């Protein structure tokens, strides 16, 4: 019997280290279960949690630096670590040229925090026995909980017969359904790994059920990025199984593991197809088909537009970009013609291109290089002399890495702590296995790093400001609940004497890029402190110079101060930065006061292509106020508006004013009111006289003709009523069916039943309620 030469005290110490290291890794992986805790966005407390765990882990590693010195030394012998460090330095340098340097700090707290967590995780993993199985079990446990949090509401929706596809109820523990879907896909390879390790049938069946239910949830969530990642994982897994099959001499038993993924996939898709029969739920194949519909799918078309302008920006700014985290501001310049309200494209929906727009081509190449090195490491591991059971694990890491890369190419996982945590874990494991492979190939010998404690010291020094920034950001996102909530509701109920303390100074823009200072300035404006508000609004312009929000508020203050030139200057500035309806309306009102029809026509010609009804209405109001009655161009615009927005009756009123003039329209309305009053008194002849007079003044208003005909009909003068109904039916038809119905009754009274029945049928076509009864009574 072999003797254990490890001293008891050393063995106990190692066990303690294993337990602590495992506990820290588990703590890291629990990041996805941190709730929003009152913040606008769940990511704020999650980033704070990540840095807090890193502080504790770094302190533990520092305290035991001698124990971990070889792990630290190994890490800094890799090209990956130095490339990662270079990327961090380059990103940090963007503070000095960024549009908004404060936003760089906010994002550095996340990017650098992730890199420090990577260092901690790598070091902690080195000494843990059975690390692959431990990580797989924890990740699978997280997968089980996340899947259940999606499955439970999903089954409830299906039971109710409701439309479950893309339902926001399926977001699970995350902020939205897309994050939930990719979080499930990236963790699923760990469950598949355990399924391959399982020795007992019931264990394999349990993992199979978990994977099946996970894929079922994914199908109903219907996130296209998750579909791509899922299918890519399936392809990689099958390829890996076939590689083992041919490498081992084609033993049939090695084909069985293919079923571990294929069967759950087929079963899950099949069940989802059956569950959607007779409902409006999108099927897997229907949703998959939209992935390539770039011209008909707005979401895909929008992404392609983002990618093109992103590449354009990189080519125009090859060395330095907008600054880390600043694409959300720069995007306004490129996408302003497509922005509605203040909803800007915060993310590129492609982390790789977005990094290029923010950090230039050097930053893009460094970030892309990280993935290139990881792929190269995977290939090296596969060709190494490592034991097959160790190389076996890297195949599943490759699946998770591919999921992250798909997510990074179609979404923005760099902003999601739940995805960053799995990514850094996969990175750490791949680098660790690469070093093990080099050691087996005798290309690397682990050696302790002298003064290894300095690595932890540097991490802790960096974590102090980083944690402070994430804390400030978390507090800000709590306060933004107040600012954004009251802004969206148009309220000012929060006390002015507390408004400056509602959010800290970091960040200086909201999650929607509205400048915090400008949002606070609204309260000072409401309380008449205009000079204080102007000071804050100028700070708001510095924070976000492209949104136009601050400039619009400044224009309103200068209008109140009767400083017309300044008001117009800032109104135009806001409109040119972001030509949205509120900016258009504010600028237009000032142009009306100045009588500047040429500028009014210019901005309308620019904005009319958006087909926003408020833009058309505001322009027509301005045109009617400044241009002569019957102006040919004004009438042409009115006709175009009615054709574009046939259901909006406001445009008919505006057209009448353009054609007839407001005074005539108002006079006709007043006379019609007199006629309606006489009709109510059953003085039908005098009512008809007044109503016909109104119709003569305003021949564009169908109701005047219709009511005149109704008055003559009620007076028993059926023949006299017919021309008025004909005017409505043939020229002004509102498609209500009322004129057709009353004219039909008039014709019945005149003995023309056949023609009357045709009119009743027309009225029924327009869903006029009394038409059915008339048809039954007179047309059978």
Give the role of each language-model region.
Residues 176, 292, 297, 302-345, ...:
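TM-adjacent membrane-interface loops and short helices in multi-pass inner/ER membrane proteins
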Residues 152-156, 220, 226, 241-297, ...:
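A membrane-periplasm/extracellular boundary helix in multi-pass inner-membrane enzymes
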Residues 526, 560, 593-594, 628, ...:
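Register position in tetratricopeptide repeats
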Residues 2-37, 51-61, 85-95, 106-120, ...:
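Alpha-helical transmembrane segments of multi-pass inner-membrane proteins
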Residues 477, 515, 549, 582-583, ...:
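Start-of-helix register in tetratricopeptide repeats
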Residues 1-92, 99-106, 116-140, 193-208, ...:
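Transmembrane signal-anchor hairpin modules in multi-pass inner-membrane enzymes, especially those
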